[in-house]
Curated annotation (Swiss-Prot):
Residues 67-76 have a biased composition (Low complexity). The keyword Chaperone applies. Keywords: Chaperone, Chromosome, DNA-binding, Nucleus, Transcription, Transcription regulation. Histones H3 and H4 chaperone involved in the nucleosome formation and heterochromatin silencing. Required for the deposition of H3K56ac-carrying H3-H4 complex onto newly-replicated DNA. Plays a role in the transcriptional regulation of the cell-cycle dependent histone genes by creating a repressive structure at the core histone gene promoter. Residues 399-417, 424-449 have a biased composition (Acidic residues). This is Histone chaperone rtt106. Residues 67-99, 368-468 are annotated as: Disordered. Belongs to the RTT106 family. It comes from Aspergillus terreus (strain NIH 2624 / FGSC A1156). GO terms for cellular component: chromosome; nucleus. PANTHER family: FACT COMPLEX SUBUNIT SSRP1, HISTONE CHAPERONE RTT106. The keyword Transport does not apply. It comes from the Eukaryota.
Length: 468
C-alpha cells in the first residue's frame, strides 16, 4: 500500500491542453503560445504565473486597440507603415490645421508627376492653394492629400542643383519652422519634416496650371525650375527661394558628371551618413538624406576645423537654437582638401569663425523679403562688402588683445611687445646675444627709443632727440 502511494506521488500532474486565458492572449502568436505550453509542461507549478501574464497581455492589447486608430490599408502607392510616418499628413506638426490642409480649395498652382524625396519617396501632384494657404502633395490615384505645410510656417526654401547626375536636375527644399534640425518645437511636439522634390531641367513634362490656366506638358518654353521658382516666390511671404551664388561659394572641383558645369556642393559625412554641403547666402545646408540640417547664420555660434590632413579635413559647426539654450556641435567629416580655401573664405566673409559675433548675426536675422532677385543680389553684395571691413577690424582688435594678455612673448608675432624693442631690434638681440654687457645696454636704450616712437607715431618727430 505504501509502495503504491510513493509511486503515485512521483507522477506529475497532467498538463492542460488548453488554458482559455493563454489562448486569448496569444491567439495571434501561435509560436509564442506553443512555447508557453512547453514551459508549463516542464514546470506545471507556474501555471498561475503564466495565466497572470496572459491576462496582463490581454489588457495591454485591449488598451492599445482603443487608444490608436486602425492601421491604414496598404495600397498600390506603398505600404501602410510608410504612410503612418507622416502623422495625419501634416508635416508642420500642427494638428489644428489638418482640416484646412485637406479641404478643397482654389489652387494657385498645381503640377502633376512631381518626384518627391521627402517626407515620402513617390510621384505626387504638387499643389499651392490660393491666398497663401498651403503647399501640399496629393496622391494621384486616391486623390487624397498626403502631406503639406502652411505657407506662413515655411522658414526656408532652397533650389539646388542635384549633384552627381548625368542629366541636370534641381531639388527644391522646403524647410518649415522648427524643422531645420537645430530648432525644435515647444511643448514636446514632434519636429516637422522638410519637403523635398525634384524637377528636371527643361520644360515641365506633365500638365500644370497657374491661377487656373492649364498648360500642357512641354508647352510654354519656360523650364520647370523657373516655373516652380516663380510660383513659390509669389506665394511666400516671409522668405524667398535661395539659390547657389558664385559670389558665395563654388567648388574647386567641377561637376564630375556634367563637363564644364560648376559645382556648388561639397561631399561630406556626418557620422556614417554621406551627404552634400551647400554654402549659401543665408546659411549652410547638409542634405539630401533624412534629416536635412540647415545652419542659418543666426543659429551658428562658430565654425572651426579639425583633423586637417593632406587630403581631407573636418568642419565643426557649433549651432544654437534661436530661442537660446546650450549650443550643439555638428561635425562634418572627410571634406576634400581642394575645397579648403573656398570654404575658409566663405566662413571668414560671414565671420562664422568668430563666436563673439554670434549675437550680431542673431540680431541681424538676414531678411530678403520683399526684394526682387536683382535688388536682393545688389543689397547682399553691399552688405557683404561693408561686413567684411567690420569683421576684419574686429578680428585685428581681438588678435591685439590676445597678444597683450599673452604671458610669454613670441618674437615672431606682430602684436605689441613688452618693452623689448621693435622687431629689428629683436633680430639684433638674437645675432649679438653673446656680446659684452655694454652692447646689451646700448640695445636696451635703442629699444626704449623705438618703443616711444611706436607709441607716439608721427608725433615723435616733433620731440627733440635729447628729450626722447
Amino acid at each position: 500500500m505504501a509502495f503504491a502511494t510513493i509511486n503515485s506521488s512521483a507522477i506529475p500532474p497532467a498538463t492542460p491542453s488548453s488554458i482559455p486565458t493563454i489562448e486569448h492572449a496569444f491567439a495571434s502568436e501561435p509560436s509564442l503560445r506553443k512555447r508557453v505550453y512547453d514551459a508549463i509542461g516542464a514546470t506545471p507549478q507556474y501555471i498561475p504565473l503564466f495565466e497572470d501574464i496572459a491576462r496582463y497581455t490581454s489588457s495591454l492589447l485591449a488598451r492599445n486597440a482603443t487608444s490608436t486608430a486602425p492601421p491604414a490599408e496598404a495600397s498600390a502607392d506603398g505600404p501602410a507603415a510608410k504612410k503612418r510616418k507622416i502623422q495625419n499628413g501634416d508635416v508642420s506638426g500642427t494638428p489644428q490645421s489638418l482640416g484646412d490642409l485637406k479641404a478643397d480649395a482654389e489652387l494657385q498652382f498645381h503640377m502633376r508627376d512631381v518626384s518627391f524625396a521627402m517626407p515620402q519617396r513617390k510621384k505626387l501632384t504638387l499643389e499651392v492653394t490660393a491666398g497663401g494657404g498651403f503647399l501640399r502633395a496629393r496622391n494621384q490615384t486616391s486623390k487624397e492629400v498626403e502631406f503639406g505645410v502652411p505657407v506662413e510656417k515655411i522658414q526656408h526654401v532652397l533650389c539646388l542643383p542635384v549633384p552627381e547626375k548625368n542629366q541636370r536636375q534641381f531639388n527644391f527644399c522646403v524647410i518649415p519652422q522648427n524643422g531645420d534640425g537645430i530648432n525644435t518645437p515647444a511643448g514636446g511636439e514632434a519636429a516637422p519634416e522638410s519637403i523635398v522634390w525634384t524637377v528636371a531641367d527643361g520644360p515641365p513634362k506633365s500638365e500644370f496650371s497657374i491661377n487656373g490656366q492649364a498648360v500642357a506638358g512641354g508647352a510654354g518654353g519656360e523650364s520647370a525650375e523657373k516655373v516652380v521658382l516663380r510660383v513659390l516666390n509669389d506665394a511666400l511671404t516671409q522668405t524667398k527661394v535661395i539659390r547657389p551664388d558664385d559670389r558665395e561659394f563654388v567648388s574647386a572641383m567641377p561637376e564630375a558628371h556634367r563637363k564644364g558645369e560648376k559645382a556648388y556642393h561639397v561631399k561630406a559625412f556626418r557620422g556614417s551618413k554621406e551627404g552634400y554641403l551647400f554654402f549659401l547666402s543665408t546659411g549652410i545646408l547638409f542634405g539630401f538624406k533624412k534629416p536635412l540640417i540647415f545652419f542659418a547664420f543666426e543659429n551658428i555660434d562658430s565654425v572651426s576645423y579639425t583633423s586637417v590632413l593632406q587630403r581631407t579635413f573636418n568642419l565643426n559647426i557649433m549651432a544654437r537654437a534661436t530661442a537660446g539654450g546650450e549650443p550643439q556641435e555638428f561635425e562634418l567629416s572627410m571634406i576634400d582638401q581642394a575645397d579648403f580655401s573656398g570654404i575658409d573664405a566663405y566662413i571668414k566673409t560671414h565671420g562664422l569663425q568668430d563666436a563673439s559675433l554670434a549675437e550680431e548675426r542673431r540680431a541681424k536675422r538676414y531678411n530678403i523679403n520683399g526684394k526682387t532677385e536683382e535688388a536682393a543680389a545688389a543689397a547682399n553684395g553691399d552688405e557683404t562688402a561693408e561686413e567684411e571691413s567690420e569683421l576684419q577690424k574686429a578680428q585685428r582688435e581681438l588678435e591685439d588683445q590676445e597678444d597683450e594678455e599673452e604671458e610669454d612673448y613670441d618674437p615672431g608675432s606682430d602684436g605689441d611687445s613688452d618693452g623689448s624693442g621693435s622687431s629689428s631690434d629683436d633680430d639684433d638681440d638674437d645675432d649679438d646675444e653673446h656680446q659684452d654687457d655694454e652692447d646689451d645696454m646700448d640695445e636696451d636704450e635703442d629699444g626704449e627709443q623705438d618703443l616711444v616712437a611706436a607709441e607716439l607715431g608721427s608725433q615723435a618727430a616733433d620731440i627733440p632727440e635729447d628729450q626722447v
